[in-house]
Amino acid sequence: MLTIDGAASANAENLERIRPAMSKARDELQREIGVERLQRAREVGVLRVMLDVDPVFPELLELPEILQVVDHTLTDTAILHLQNGFILPPVEAMGYTVEEAREIFQFSFHRDFRRYLEGYLGCVNTLLNIDEFRESNGATVFVPGTHQLRKDPSRAYLEANAIPAEAPAGSMFVYDASVWHGSGLNTSGEDRLAVNHVFTRSYMKQQIDYVRALGSGFILSLPPRTQQLLGWYTRVVTSNDEYFQPPDKRLYRPNQG
């Protein structure tokens, strides 16, 4: 796991744009889905489709720090598997007991990429820390050396070797998505914000079909590299007419990895 300081503010102007945008995304999600439904799904504070809520979110995909990581690890044909916002409330405000919270996916030890590929890197995370990450406000805990393992470590091993990743606001964690990690519990009395990006090889299915979710008009309003990251050049054809197109008009462009 690598920590890069100052990444979140490099192209998003400043962190103060991101915080209200995340609050807006949370409000829109709660209106659409409802708080009770989110609690049943154990998704309180998780923001899944927010790219069209505020321009600051697609702008994050232009950050040089992120693009350099993606290009170096997965090549420039990689695509965005997900962009998730996290507004981690204090545990007492979540509507769960501490014991219940520890069983929620993001709080339990897990891997974001669960396949063992004999050392082949298929998926990379770039986690932007919008607020300072401290153990007291639920900093992500990592278990060093647990990426690319053929067999799962025991829970006792994970608990004994987990390290809270503390870092200042505006920093970015970069890590192999197969490393074991989990969110800590927030006991600070205040929300803790972060935005996670997971990137994969272009032939791996996205968590969200961003082209369908956002619409072609929105996608085409973005820079070409952002279009590519969102999957615009790796769409799946639905008819013979779409298949038999010249190379520059094909939904799945050549040389996409």
Question: Locations of the language-model features?
Answer:
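Short, solvent-exposed loop/turn segments at secondary-structure junctions
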Residues: 8-10, 86-88, 133-135, 147-148, ...
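Short hydrophobic-aromatic micro-motifs
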Residues: 2, 128, 173-175
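A structural signal for short, well-ordered beta-strand segments
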Residues: 83-85, 126-128, 195-199
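Residues that flank catalytic or metal-binding motifs in active/ligand-binding sites
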Residues: 53, 81-82, 122, 136-138, ...
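Catalytic core of non-heme Fe(II) oxygenases with the double-stranded beta-helix
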Residues: 94-167, 204-214
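Non-heme Fe(II)-dependent double-stranded beta-helix
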Residues: 2-110, 114-116
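Conserved double-stranded beta-helix
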Residues: 149-150, 154-174, 178-179, 184-257
